[in-house]
Amino acid sequence: RHKVSAFTFSLLPDEKPRYMMGIGEPRDILDGVEMGCDMFDCVLPTRNGRNGCAFTYRGRLNIRNSRFSSMKDPVEAECGCYTCTHFSAGYLRHLFNIGEGLGPVLLSLHNITFFMRFMEDIRNSVMNGSFKDFKQHFLQIFYKGNQQ
């Protein structure tokens, strides 16, 4: 996929925006930015949120995992989203376990916020010339911490 994207981007004019549809995996977004892509959209944050997967800067978390059963902390302490500022990971796990519709909504909200923060960090790293370092550091931590 990387080779196809790189080839396709080489055919596009530099002065026009470049858009990748359906790209939501953080590694793919970072690769796309490195190739010159400007815009992305994908259902991944909400689809994964509906299924109990939370994106964090330390990797994916499966909120149904028993280790969250009595956790009083939010899904991600550094996140300022409504979910993380009002609900514990243990409560979210409870919502998923009883089939309460609020759980998927709250986790989707967190995931959307994660991707907004992620894209903001990418933009900042591009503007200050540290994108390659940001990408390497992010990938090292995110995929090492993947706990799905």
Please provide the spans of the model-predicted regions.
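C-terminal extensions of enzymes
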Residues: 76-148
